[in-house]
UniProtKB/Swiss-Prot annotation:
It comes from Saccharomyces cerevisiae (strain ATCC 204508 / S288c) (Baker's yeast). This is Putative uncharacterized protein YER006C-A. The lineage of its organism: Eukaryota, Fungi, Dikarya, Ascomycota, Saccharomycotina. Partially overlaps PAC2. It comes from the Eukaryota.
Length: 105
């Protein structure tokens, strides 16, 4: 069965990085260089990469728990209201809920 994780491409941070433009200015005999890739820009790139990593992990988590199978079953079902053995076989799979440990320190 086709997985949605195959659709999402993997990209390193170098694809997001803009070309660095170093401009050097002279002011009272001192050379001042400015860089367009400043600290806030680097932080925004880091946040976007962390969000992308969590997105991939979420897709893999959903694939592991098979909670996205209802999309594939609804697409592959020929008759919408039919009661077949395949639909009865998958009916108990959606009732599973994740275990929440409340006493973890």
């Amino acid at each position: 069965m086709f997985s949605p994780a195959v659709i999402v491409p993997f990209h390193p941070i170098s694809f997001y990085r803009r070309p660095r433009l170093n401009n050097t200015y002279e002011f009272d005999g001192a050379k001042i260089s400015t860089n367009l890739e400043s600290v806030p820009n680097f932080i925004s790139h880091a946040i976007s990469e962390i969000r992308f990593a969590f997105y991939i992990l979420y897709i893999l988590y959903m694939k592991h728990n098979k909670s996205w199978n209802f999309l594939m079953i609804s697409l592959s079902k020929e008759q919408k209201g039919s009661k077949t053995k395949k639909n009865k076989m998958y009916s108990n799979e959606f009732k599973s809920t994740p275990i929440i440990y409340s006493n973890v320190i």
